[in-house]
Design a protein with these regions (language model features):
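A solvent-exposed interaction/effector surface
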Residues: 1-165
Length: 165
């Protein structure tokens, strides 16, 4: 039995989301190095980023067309403007979009299982299409609510999958 089939996904809510500007740390990962993503989060100066809006965090996955299975990942926060991005921080503009929004249940270390269930079970069964990304636009977004505790790895986490209109 695959790991994806052990995850019981609730039906997602479909929601139109406004555009966001997310600033943070960005790195390229491969399937072999994706276990290093938590180290990127540990380096993020959360709460100290100029013009940070709120206490939510975003993990933005994009440029996943790499033939090696690689992808770019940005660990960041919403900011009010680009001028606030300093040092080794970078930003990504997330366009207004319709999303299928899934609630992840459990520890953050099991998030990959939820994502696998979304891609390999829900998406084929839903007969929906993922939005074809333009260069640099997100292919999936992790949303960490204010109650997410990075020390325990628990709290509200959502996975946003951009859909074709």
């Amino acid at each position: 039995m695959s790991e994806a089939s052990t995850v019981k996904l609730q039906e997602p809510r479909l929601q139109d989301r406004r555009a966001l500007l997310v600033a943070g740390l960005r790195r390229h990962y491969t399937p072999e190095t994706m276990n290093e993503i938590p180290a990127l989060w540990q380096r993020l100066p959360f709460g100290k980023i100029p013009s940070q809006l709120g206490h939510m965090a975003y993990g933005v996955l994009f440029n996943q067309s790499d033939p090696t299975g690689g992808f770019d990942y940005l660990a960041g926060v919403e900011v009010s403007g680009v001028s606030a991005v300093l040092g080794d921080l970078t930003y990504v503009k997330i366009p207004a979009q319709k999303y299928a929004i899934f609630c992840h249940r459990g520890h953050v270390s099991k998030l990959k299982d939820t994502m696998a269930a979304i891609w390999h079970e829900w998406l084929p069964a839903s007969h929906r299409s993922v939005s074809h990304p333009t260069a640099g636009s997100p292919q999936m977004i992790e949303y960490y609510a204010e109650n997410f505790d990075p020390q325990t790895g628990l709290g509200d986490i959502e996975v946003w999958l951009p859909l074709e209109a």
